[in-house]
Amino acid sequence: MHQVPLAVLVASICLYVPAGATDTPNKVGSDELSQIVAAAQNMPDADLAQKFAAMELTDRLSGTRLADLTSRLPGDMSRRALMLIADQSIFLPPPADEIPLDAAPNAASVQQMLVNVVNYINATNRQLPNLMAMRFSNGFEDQPREDRMGRTGLESTFSLPLHWVGSLKVQVTYRDRQEMEDKSVKAEKKGNGVAGLITTGEFGPILSIVLADASKGKLAWTRWERGSGGTMAVFHYQVPEDKSNYHVKSCCILEGYNQDGTPRTQVSNVRSAYHGDIVFSPVDGSIRLLTMEAEAPAGALVSVASIAVEYAATDIGGRSYICPVRSVSMQRVHTTELSGGITGSSYKGPVKTFLNDVRFSNYRRFGTKTKVLTNLP
């Protein structure tokens, strides 16, 4: 489970199976990807999906550009394959042509931008109305080749690259500054649904926690970016472990067995240093993209724990609010053996990767029936 609660930022995962190796990817930039999509208008869905699966982006594909390219694709397989490579690029800098060469701001301007960001986050926490939205999650996992002891003897799994495993559509509410799943609306599940990684806190807590942590670490202006709302500023931050509220949890390490033969496990909980970018409007401080990447120590069970949240202007009840429209969560985790009497402290399995893509849409005020759609892919 991967959560962002109000008081402590937590990344965690529950698993009992392990990350497969893939062939060397074909590295392409966003512009080249756009050309590939334009040239593939008559390509079958499965063939185009396979073509995307062999690619790795070298720069960040913006949400706006992703939506445009997605609208041109022939089917679900190619859309999911594009989603996957785009999600993995969200932690990268944008293409060079989206980085203006304007002069760097002076110290006074940087300080004012920081004040704007602080004021924006404080205002968001106070002024965001009680609302409802649909949260649509797509889950991706890989599978390594592994031999392990099972109930009937040695069992082998075959290597698979990152692939779509399922989706989950639920209604969420944000009420009195608390985000929760609306159990009164039946969830819609496809495939195996979404397991392993679950995020919450995109509506405000994650912003407050990161800014509070970053203020105790290092925070500096790093570049300009060209966004859909004009020129954006970027702060890069680094948070040391002793100032961090980012805890990386991994479940489960085997401690031993109970008298009835069932495994007795514990959750590893490690406070982690982390870093990331805050992309925001220098005019009003509104956040457009937040990234977080844990700095795992050598030998850690969790080698990657990253979160990115993209925000955009959204109409709710006739007023415009900056709300989350997309989030990406990714973890790479060593599995631990739960059979054969080998403890997690003495055995680490191969690495398994989990990635979740989450989209928010159909925003409306709590208690109303009018649905306002956002322009999401």
Indicate residue ranges for each PLM-predicted region.
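Structured extracytoplasmic
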Residues: F91-H275, P282-R288, E293-I307, A312-P377
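N-terminal secretory signal peptides that target proteins for export/translocation
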Residues: M1-H2
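General marker for long, soluble alpha-helical cores
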Residues: G20-P100
